[in-house]
Amino acid sequence: MTDSNTLFSRAQQVIPGGVNSPVRAFKGVGGTPVFIQKAKGAYIWDTDDKQYVDYVGSWGPMILGHNHPAILSAVIKTAENGLSFGAPTPIEIDLAELVCKLIPSMEMVRMVSSGTEATMSAIRLARGYTNRDKIIKFEGCYHGHADSLLVKAGSGALTLGQPNSPGVPADFAKHTLTCTYNDLESVKQAFEQYPQDIACIIVEPVAGNMNCVPPQNNFLQGLRELCNQYGAVFIIDEVMTGFRVALGGAQSYYNVEPDLTCLGKVIGGGMPVGAFGGKKEIMQFIAPTGPVYQAGTLSGNPIAMAAGLACLTELQKAGNQERLAQLTEKLALGLKALADKHHVPFTVNYVGGMFGLFFTDKAQVTCYQDVMACDTEKFKVFFHKMLDEGVYLAPSAFEAGFMSLAHTDADIDRTLTAADKAFAALA
């Protein structure tokens, strides 16, 4: 019995399902979750001291790699002055200024402590600003676990086989309209049905919670135009894509300007940070300057701000984004070539520093229905073969993978050697 087995048994006695976030329980792949004791660079070590090349990266934040010296130094230095004050600090201004510089559509930004807080608050703000109730989201996209967003939710809810979460009142859900990702016609129909009632569209610019599904040509631009036409607020959820698809986010990569942007993951450098921001005229509707309420005891926590500032300062150095994309492409194309070699139906989507693996004979995966048609049983076998070989992938067929700047060409080669064996087992 491994140490992870023992720990999981203990955890299940005091933590629901033995984990503090459902996907970690390995329900999507079977078996016992791997308990991690330490991490450095591109690697994690389990409690039996086995090393893995890590493509989860704490689900996205670790874009520089684990335990990066610049972030660690900033956290230690800041912690020496105190852990939390519940008052304004200079460093939260520093981070806000840098975020607004890197993502120009964000004229003002409010810091929170999670991506869920960011999306929840942005939607409340959009509703208050427009004085409308209904929102549009997309099937298979996930924006955190706020009640109004767990309607045909993706990611963990897909893995659990519960596309509609119990506990969400029907009166909440009725205000959420769910359209088809990459299908502008479905969005047009929603606006035509409720032309005066829709407060906002919220969308992942790259759907990263039904694995990795990029937008098709003009999809995001089409959403922008529909929001302009009907007076709705256009919210781009960059919790996953922010600073990872491009330094200016996916909105920069795809050349589209939202009214509001939600951030998380990378902005905290591994600490719990979220943010939402956008046009000044909308952001001034938030308290204390406006009537829409939002608050948080740990919002702008100085240690989290220090980690985020150090992360983004390092990330903006010349060549980093190009290197991240280069590594991701090498991995993606290498995996596809190996799948073809072993005659395993397989497609890879990738953009910037994120990628998605699909066991399917479809040449393209562009929406929720395409994802749901993939062979999850093959993914389970592949996942465990890779785990045995020391490669840690997301333990779900519905989650994206993440590259970091700490990964090397040698790490990619090691991963592809493992994948050769894994695909051979599936042939």
UniProtKB/Swiss-Prot annotation:
Keyword set includes Phosphoprotein: no
Assembly description: Homodimer.
Keyword tags: Cytoplasm, Isomerase, Porphyrin biosynthesis, Pyridoxal phosphate
Gene this protein is translated from: hemL
Classification via Pfam families: Aminotran_3
Molecular function in Gene Ontology: glutamate-1-semialdehyde 2,1-aminomutase activity; pyridoxal phosphate binding; transaminase activity
NCBIfam families with a match to the protein in the record: hemL, PRK00062.1
A Gene Ontology BP annotation from the UniProt entry: protoporphyrinogen IX biosynthetic process
Keyword Cytoplasm: yes
Predominant localisation class: cytoplasm
Species name: Mannheimia succiniciproducens (strain KCTC 0769BP / MBEL55E)
Entry's Gene Ontology cellular component terms: cytoplasm
Identification of the protein by name: Glutamate-1-semialdehyde 2,1-aminomutase
EC number: 5.4.3.8
Disulfide bonds: none
